[in-house]
From Swiss-Prot:
It is an enzyme of class 5 (isomerase). It comes from Methanococcus maripaludis (strain C7 / ATCC BAA-1331). This is N-(5'-phosphoribosyl)anthranilate isomerase. The gene is trpF. It catalyses: N-(5-phospho-beta-D-ribosyl)anthranilate = 1-(2-carboxyphenylamino)-1-deoxy-D-ribulose 5-phosphate. GO terms for biological process: L-tryptophan biosynthetic process. Its EC number is 5.3.1.24. It comes from the Archaea. GO terms for molecular function: phosphoribosylanthranilate isomerase activity. InterPro entries: Aldolase_TIM, PRAI_dom, RibuloseP-bd_barrel, TrpF_fam.
Length: 208
């Protein structure tokens, strides 16, 4: 199963993540305690042996162009209401792999109805990968009854409040294509190797 460990800030964190995950991410041009500068991001991209996603909440094409040019990454993770026209321009101009985030409510009175609404939204986009998240790096789980329904229709990456203790049961129930974690594998505001190791072992132990 695809495992992305997001929000790295240093070469030391990158080295840990490379040992366990399939991809990582750097937080850029948005309000986040994990945000780093573009020059730092470029250094991590150049050092990395795995894909490094540039993660941002911006919907401005000029900001995305700046990110691409100054970090050298070909992987973008978009947490905004960016339109398909802008996505098409970026893909055609730069050939980037684009993962688009779709917000799932924390709780739902009608999971089937909410899932259908989100599926309808997803179907208006043409992107390389779909991310289901609770919010913009809030570290909270969402109503997995919704993501379970969506995962039957699309190969989704599941995010939001995942940690070593809950990820086995969540993955077993939702059956995503992959998972994305950040705060759930941190201790003292840094990526923790033991937590990352446990997280990845628990993900890989799920029999789907």
């Amino acid at each position: 199963m695809f495992i992305k460990i997001c929000g790295i800030k240093t070469p030391e964190e990158l080295e840990i993540v490379e040992s366990y995950g399939n991809a990582t991410g750097v937080i850029l041009e948005c309000a986040s305690k994990r945000r780093i500068g573009l020059e730092t991001a470029k250094n991590l991209v150049n050092l990395s042996n795995i894909p490094v996603f540039a993660v941002s909440t911006t919907s401005e094409v000029l900001v995305w162009e700046n990110i691409i040019k100054l970090t050298n990454t070909n992987y973008l993770q978009m947490h905004s209401d960016i339109d398909q026209k802008t996505i098409d321009f970026i893909k055609n101009e730069y050939g980037c792999f684009i993962m688009k985030s779709f917000k799932i409510p924390e709780t739902s009175e009608s999971p089937e109805i909410d899932a259908e609404k989100i599926i309808s939204d997803i179907e208006t986009y043409e992107v390389d990968r779909i991310l289901l998240d609770t919010g913009k790096g809030c570290g909270q789980t969402h109503d997995h009854r919704i993501s379970q329904i969506i995962a039957k229709k699309f190969d989704i990456i599941l995010a939001g409040g995942l940690d070593p203790d809950n990820v086995f049961d969540i993955v077993k129930n939702v059956k995503p294509f992959g998972v994305d974690v950040s705060s759930g594998v941190e201790a003292n505001n840094s990526k923790d190797e033991e937590l990352i190791k446990r997280f990845c072992e628990n993900v890989k132990s799920v029999k789907l």
